[in-house]
Structure formats: C-alpha cells, structure tokens
Amino acid sequence: MSLRFVIGRAGSGKSTLCLHEVQEELKQRPRGKTILYLVPEQMTFQTQQALIGSEDVRGSIRAQVFSFSRLAWKVLQEVGGASRLHIDEAGVHMLLRKIVESRKDGLSVFQKAAEQNGFFEHLGSMIAEFKRYNVTPSNVYEMWQQLDTHSSSAEQKLLANKVYDLQLLYDDFERALIGKYLDSEDYLQLLIEKLSDSEYVKGAEIYIDGFHSFSPQELEIVRGLMRLGTRVTITLTIDEKTLAQPVNELDLFYETTLTYERIKQVAREEKIEVEKTIPLMKQPRFHSQALAHLEMHYEARPNEKFHGEASVTISTAANLRAEVEGVAREIRRLVATEDYRYRDIAVLLRNGESYYDVMRTLFTDYNIPHFIDEKRPMSHHPLVECIRSALEIISGNWRYDAVFRCVKTELLYPLDVRKEAMREEMDEFENYCLAYGVQGKRWTSEDPWMYRRYRSLDDASEMITDSEREMEEKINRLRDVVRTPVIRMQKRLKRAGTVMQMCEAVYLFLEELDVPKKLEALRIRAEESGDFLFATDHEQVWEEVMSLLDTFVEMLGEEKMSLSMFTDVMTTGLEALQFANIPPSLDQVLVANIDHSRLSDIKATFIIGVNEGVIPAAPMDEGMLSDEERNVLTAAGIELAPTTRQTLLEEQFVMYQMVTRASEKLYISCPLADEEGKTLLASSFIKKIKRMFPDVKESFITNDVNDLSRSEQLSYVATPEVTLSYVMQQLQTWKRYGFEGNLDFWWDVYNFYVTSDEWKQKSSRVLSSLFYRNRAQKLSTDVSRDLYGDTIKGSVSRMELFNRCAYAHFAQHGLSLRERDIFKLDAPDIGELFHAALKRIADKLLRENRTWADLSIKECEHLSALVIEEIAPLLQRQILLSSNRHFYLKQKLQQIIFRTSLILREHAKSSGFVPVDLEVPFGMGGTGSLPPMEFALPNGVKMEVVGRIDRVDKAEDESGTFLRIIDYKSSSKALDLTEVYYGLALQMLTYLDVVTSNAHTWMKKGSTASPAGVLYFHIHNPIVEMKGDASEEEIEKEILKKFKMKGLVLGDADVVRLMDNKLSTGSSDIISAGLKKDGSFSARSSIASEQEFNVLQKYVHHSFENIGKDITEGVIDIAPYKKGNKAACTFCNFKSVCQFDESLEDNQFRTLKDMKDSEAMEKIREEVGGE
C-alpha cells in the first residue's frame, strides 16, 4: 500500500502519464488485478474514450473509469446495500416540500421563505452540503443549542433560528430516508461504510485524476482506497516551487496545495507509504509558444510580456448575438481552412442562461454540430405543463389562466382530431370564455352554456338566431373536451384516501388522454423534421414523469394528504425534472460551463461572455447561509463549503484552468450590450491578457457588414440560412446610397438565391421586404362597393373615426375587425348603463306627466336604486352580479345616478327648457324614428348618417321654439371648434341639425324650431374641497357648479336665461355662459349666433359629403391625426394591423394645428362660403 503524487502545472502531461501507465499495464498484463481510474463525473466519458483510444488497447475488463458515485454503485452491487430505493433530485424536493408543509407552524425563519421560488432547491443543496461535509442532524442540533445560549444581537438570533429550522427539517428528512431510501449523497456515505468489504477494490491499482479538492466525504473514500489499494496515484495541478514555500491563500495553487497536504496527512494517519512525488516540468500540451507563455507566467506580478505573433485573439462584439455569430464564423473557418475537426474546439462560458438559446439557433443555422453540456429543465414540456395546470385547475377553482394553459398543451385534444382545425376552434372557445367570464362552478355545472351576440342593452330581449344556436352547440362540445378528463381526475382526487390513490388519479388522467400515443406522434414528427434532440425529449419526459409518480408513491404512498398539499408537492417535483444530456457524438463542438467543465485534447478554445462581474465572478451570497453565518459555524467547528470570499480567491485558479485548456488557439470575447440593448463592460481579465500580449490580435464583431473591408465581408458569406440577412443589408445599402464596386460579390450571392431551386421561393419572401412600403393602396371601386354596399349607413362616430384615421375606419367597418371581448366593465359599458338608467327614469316621468323638478330627494334615491336593479341583469352578461367586487361597484354606480338625478332636478327647477324626448333615433327605422341625414354622393352612392340622440330639450317664448341637445358623458368634455373643423367632433352639431330640420314632423305639425345650443352633461359624483365649516347648502351649491354643462349655446340673452332663470349677471352655475351688467356676454361664454349655427350645420353636411366621397372611392390611408398631445393611435385597437411606424418614410402623423374658436369659425365659414 502506497501513495504517489503526480504534480505539475496545467498542460504538463499528468493525465497523459497516468493513461499511458494504465495502457502499458493492460498491454503487458490484460488479466491482472483491477485498475480503478477515478475522475470527476464530467470527465468519465472522455477519459473512457482516451483509455481505449490507443491502437494497442481496444477494450478492457481489467481497467474501469469511475466517478465517486459510480464507484459507490459498483461496490454496493458487489457487497450489498443498494437495495434501498434511490430518490433523485425531484424526489428529494417533493419529500422536503411535504416535510416543510407539515412543519410549517413550527418553523421560525422558513415559514414564509418556503413560498419563494427556488426555496426547495436551496434547501436540498444545504442538506446535500451537510452530508458531503459529514455534518449530521445531531451536529446541527448541538450548534443550535450553542447559538441559542449565546445569542445577543439580532443577527445572532436570526442565525440561531435559521439553524433551528435547518436541524428540524434535516432530521425529518433523514428519518424519512432511514431504511427505505438513498439520495445521491447517501451513496458516498454507504461507500465509506462498505468499501472495506469489497474484493473488487482490494489490491487494485488506483488512479485519481482531474480533482483539485475533495469534500470531507470524498476524502474519507480516498482514505479507504489507500487502505485497500496496492498503490494510489493522485494527480494535482501544482507548481513544484509552491510546495517548497509556506501555504499562502493568495497563491494560484492554494486550493490544490491544501488538498496535497490533507491527503498526505491522511496517509500519515493510516501509516501509508508516500512515494517520491513525480513533478512534471515540461509543457507537452502547448503547440503554441504564446499559450505556453500564458500558462507559465499567468500568475506573475508584474505581467510577463510576450512579443511576437500571438495565437490569442481578443474580440469585442456589438451585442451578444453578434458575438456568437463571430464565434460560429471562426469555427467554420478553422474547420474549412486549417484542418480542424469540430471535436478539437470548445466554447467555454459562465452565464449560459443568456447564451444557450442563441447558440442552439445560430450553430444550427451555421451547420455546426455541437453539444451543450447543460441539463435543460422539463418544466416547459407540454406533459409537465398539462399535469401542473390540471392540478392547478382543480385546486384553484377552475381559473381561466390555468384552464387555458392546460388546453394549449394540446394533450386534451382527442387523439384522432386534426390539430389545426382544433386549434382554431379552441381559439374561438377561449374568446367565449373571456367574454363571458367563465370560471369556477360554471365549468362543473351540468347546465348548458348560452351564447348570445351581445352589442348593447337593446339586444337583451332579442330571440336567439340559428347561427347563435350553432355556436352554442360548438361551445358546449368543446367545453366537454376540456372539462371531462379534468373533472374525472377531480372526482378521483377527492375520493382518494391516500397519496397512492391520488397518484393513480393523475396516471389515469394521462392514460385516458392517450398521452403516450400523443407523445409518440410528437416524437415521430420531430424525427421527420430532423430535430432529434426534441424527439428524445418526448421519450424522456414520459419516463421521468412515471418515475416521479413511482417515487411519490414509494415515499408517501400510504399517507393522507390534502389536495392543496398534493398539488404543491407534485408541482415541486415536476419543477425539478431535467432532461438527461445525450452523450456527444465523436465530432461536435463542445459548449461547457467554465466552473464544471473538465476538457482534454482541445486545440482551440473560445471563451465568450468575458464581462465584468461574470469573469471573474462578482461575489454573491447564495443559498441558505450568508458568508458571515458560515464563518460563525466554521469557528464553532462545523466545516462547510467555501464562503464567497474563498470562492473568489479560487476564481484565479478557475480562470487559469480556463485559459490553459487549448493547445493551439485561444479566443476571448465579450459583448458590449445584452439582448435587451443594456450596456455591458469588458472584464478586467481582458486587460490582463492585453498586458501579457501587447501584440495580441483585436477585432470588433458587428452584425452590420457595411463598414467592413471586402475581405472581411467575405467571411460573412457562410450558410444560405445566415447569409440571407447580410445580402439584405447590402441591398438596403445599395437602395439607399447607390451601387459601390467593392460590393460586387454580393450580387453573385444575390444571384445564388434567385436562381437556386431550393432557395428561390424562401428568399423571395425575405428579399421582397426590401421594397416594402407601409402604405395602404386605394381600394378599387368594385372592392369598395363590395365592402360598403351601394348605400352607406353609418353613425356620426363612424364618420369621425374616418377623419381620425382612414385605415382605422377600413379595419373596423370594411374588414369588420374588433378586439376580442373580455368579461370586464369598461367605460363604454358604464356609459351605456348611465344612459339607460337616466332614460328609464325620464320615461317614467313622461308617463306620469311629471318633470325632474317634481321629484323629491327620496324619490331620486329610490328611482336610481330601482333602475340599477333593473339594468344590472342585462348589462355585459350580468357582470355587476358576478362578484362581491362588482356588487360594490354597482352600489357606487347607483350613487352616481342618484347624484345625477339630484342635479337634473336642480337644473329643471332653474330652467325653462324641458326634456321632450330621450334616446331619439334617426335613420333607425321603426316608430318614432326621425329620418336619416341623407346624401347623394357624386359617384352615385347614397349615404345615410344615422344615430341616437341622448336628450332633446325644448323651450318656448314669444320669439318662438328653441331646441337644444344634451349629451350625457361619463367624462368631462367641451365642444372644440378646431375639432369640428377637422371633422373630429361632428356629433352634437349633427344631432342639433337633425332635430331642428325635422321639427315640423315630430313636434306640432308645421312648427319650426331654432337651435338653442349643444351641451355635454358630465355624469359623475364629484368630491369638493371646502374651506372652514361649510353649511350643507354651500356644499350642494359647490357640487352643482361641478355639473356645469359645457358646449355651445345661442348668443341670445333671453335664451340663455331660459336655460338658467336664476342668472341675471355673472356666470351661470348651469351652462358655460355669463352676462355682464350691460346685458352682453362675458368673454368666457361659449356662444354662437344663429347665423353661425347655420354655418356650422352647413359645414357638417359639407364634411359628411367629403367623408362619404373618400370612403366610396376607397381611401384607406394609414394617416392618423395628431393634435397637441392627442393622437389617433393612442387608444386605437388596430395598431398591430396597420403597423404604423414613424421611422418609415411613408408613416407620418397628420399634424393638426390647434386654433382659437374664432380662427376655427373663420376657416369653417370660408369652407362653406358663409358670411
């Protein structure tokens, strides 16, 4: 029994020496005693390849490559002890979740922390760390007692409470495992206990290679191997000079030196002979003088400079994507021109989560075979999401998001259905559920769902149509597709008495959905499309889910568990599932993490993402214990994993290992911006390399090839997939600035695409965008007629929409596009309720031959409550009755109607105008409807402007009859004559024109009426601020002022006094007008003469004629208006359709100039030729 060290700097040939010894021994004595070759888990595959890669050794039974965990399996299979069930990381997380849930009330610190993402991953890691460092639950308990006794500060008490929680959970976890289960760390402990019984290990020649340090648990295994083996050879990366000096924590080889001393100490304790150390001084790995210099002088202070051409390249990239593309281009160049194999190349990085998706896409586009040495989570696979969301449906009372997350996995679809058709139907079904607010008991009720096309309160009494009945049948059929399997599982889960029965319910749910067959179909489809990675995913995920259910049953099968806890535990397990990595092929680029990789036989290394805070890593507290807390525990005798300070000291060694992997070329790069465009800084490590290599090659990698030389541009011509985007860049440059001779080879590339049978069609779609202009072509006369008909019938709002943006009008009224309905109370719904409520009260007063002035305060309150109760069941699919929140909102709306009723009562008392009709239709047909505003357009098309007028008031005096329009608004509004001029506010003047023009037919026969004005009434329940102790009368007066109606009234003092009979001089509290002492109007009065009203009405006609002409001539310009801070696009539903973009030459706002009312009136007069 002896111990031998083989030491040397990186690249000195330590592993090569050991492998050659083993190979020579196998060649001389192929049937001798066992040879164990122990390496880190990440090195097992490549070491096995290297061991049998010699021409003289094609295979071996005598020599075996193991990691510690694989050796444990081997020994336990031989001597016994492996019969207990293995639980993987997912099983550990599930068990911990169950333990935490059952212990929750007794936890001090982790009670709330347990709900945070990643908690169980950290807790599992903490327990694994305890085991690796031989810390038992009793050790943790003793530590808690010690801390609890001596804690004085808040920080000490927090640590004591944290340690208390940890010992409780660790102890429960260990008790749950005893005699039944083994987790990954338990195998090493069992190996320590059983190793001495192994005949396989006794007398073996043992090599331990590729380690830099050992945990206490691993060190005990090394101790056991020393006792049993003939000779143990351990390789360590140490400079021989370091061993001759005192151990210094700042030394590059500090970690490996400590490991060397610890192992020698174990050998002394076990009285094992320590052979003479073999120091390796040469650098056989490096075929490049520059890389040999980098290795030899990496830690030198000051930096030793290397002059001459260096095989080191430093690149900065415009962004992360440009960096990866630069790497891909260089890899292709090495393979194409320098006789490299893909397996000779490695890409090292640290922040893989930022890079992996981009690398998979780009390396595939560049046809670079690659292997990413990183496990992917299964959490996004349809099967995992289906189980998780189905359980969430049941535990969360059938919430919309959970239901449709489950639907979108497509595993609920019948097996033989056409997926494309089913997706379309499910989209319609989802729209229905959103519009009707379907959730909770409505899913489980047997009552059929109803479908009605809802537009307004008036639709509530209409009969169901055939198309509605057909849609209703489809909706109920799809409802059963979604709910039936979930309800079956729900019933089984509720009947289940044990965890085993609950797991069985999940399994039957999957089986009844034919999930195995559906996954097989997905696998076949992935293989047919050449996506072999995802093809294996579908196989793995089913096996892993079944294994998870088996583990759940094995661990907790006979226990009783609530549905919510079962869901939490199952979800925790599902989130821990990972896809196993498929071993790399013999010729792939290896992409690996700097911290975990163990590489050999690499000629060229690309180190990417070398940004500040990433390489070297910024210190960061992670896990259950902070650095300070770990130091306290270490001082008390509990050894744990290194603190972030120790890790930071070790970072130099990690970086040394990183830059010494390659034998010929080293590439270092960093992006200057991330995927979101945020600025990133280059690492100080790059400055260090520049100091060592003053002549280093530096380059800037960009996505834009325009500024590059011809030779540099040629490197961007790679595969057809990626080159197409660069062809587009060049053509855009040519289009914008003209042809340049040094770019002529791009025309050859362009010709390849347009003549290639394979790429002609694919490229035409991309290249055609070069001439894309975001302009809407004018519709032909025929198309316009087909869309709008021979007679255009539209509301004033439609006409105003056309003037806001012609394309928005086309989208809404030509294409009939609309946003999908959502079950929520929007401003239009509230406005509709207000209108309906006030109309019902007014109708009741008309029937009783009363006015608003006749109402008492109590009657106003009673009537407001009554009409709200009548309307609530009819509004937006009974939304006001759907929840406590909406019931509260109903009460608030009733208060607003009550307040509005009081104000209308006060207005009526002060006014000579009385309502003569409400919700007056024109052009709508039926009894009581006034005729539409009709236009015969020059192209022969008829146009009718139709609508409904909120309220028409009438007053009479000796000079005649006057009519005014009142429009109820749920927000404050005034009449802006600038907006009238631009056709954005035509509604009120149209209404006034309709009622005055048709006065002879709907009032007394043959009577005429003059315009008195148009006014907006703001429906709200205002809050007023009063100074001092104000009386109730003063408060009511102030509230009345808040309801002052804005608009435009006739500039006749008598008519104004009819509107406010309390007005003598000063400003009116009711309308936006005021009188001076001499009887003239104040400057702030919104007034117009009768002649001006006539001009305005003519202008309205003029505007409609122009709008009608443009609509029928097919004008659909993408030309939204902008006026001050108002723009047509602000609340437009069609922005995603028109794709208006100000950066495009053709897309600019129509900027409208704001004007004073007098200026606007003058321009209006000019347009119609008025005087």
Curated annotation (Swiss-Prot):
Function: The heterodimer acts as both an ATP-dependent DNA helicase and an ATP-dependent, dual-direction single-stranded exonuclease. Recognizes the chi site generating a DNA molecule suitable for the initiation of homologous recombination. The AddB subunit has 5' -> 3' nuclease activity but not helicase activity.
PANTHER family named in the record: RECBCD ENZYME SUBUNIT RECC (PTHR30591:SF1)
Binding site for [4Fe-4S] cluster: 805, 1129, 1132, 1138
InterPro entries, A to Z: ADDB_N (IPR049035), DNA_helicase_suAddB (IPR014140), DNA_helicase_UvrD-like_C (IPR014017), P-loop_NTPase (IPR027417), PDDEXK-like_dom_sf (IPR011604), PDDEXK_AddAB-type (IPR038726)
One GO BP annotation of this record: double-strand break repair via homologous recombination
Designated gene of the protein: addB
Cofactor(s) this protein requires: Mg(2+); [4Fe-4S] cluster
Taxonomic placement: Bacteria, Bacillati, Bacillota, Bacilli, Bacillales
Family: Belongs to the helicase family. AddB/RexB type 1 subfamily.
Enzyme Commission code: 3.1.-.-
Domain UvrD-like helicase ATP-binding: 1-301
Residues where ATP binds: 8-15
Keywords assigned: 4Fe-4S, ATP-binding, DNA damage, DNA repair, DNA-binding, Exonuclease, Helicase, Hydrolase, Iron, Iron-sulfur, Metal-binding, Nuclease, Nucleotide-binding
Assembly behavior: Heterodimer of AddA and AddB.
Co-factor binding comment: Binds 1 [4Fe-4S] cluster.
UvrD-like helicase C-terminal domain sequence ranges: 281-587
Pfam families assigned to the protein according to its UniProt record, in alphabetical order: ADDB_N (PF21445), PDDEXK_1 (PF12705), UvrD_C (PF13361)
Entry superkingdom: Bacteria
Misc. comment: Despite having conserved helicase domains, this subunit does not have helicase activity.
Name of the molecule in the record: ATP-dependent helicase/deoxyribonuclease subunit B
PROSITE patterns: UVRD_HELICASE_ATP_BIND, UVRD_HELICASE_CTER
Organism: Bacillus mycoides (strain KBAB4)
Single GO molecular function: 5'-3' exonuclease activity
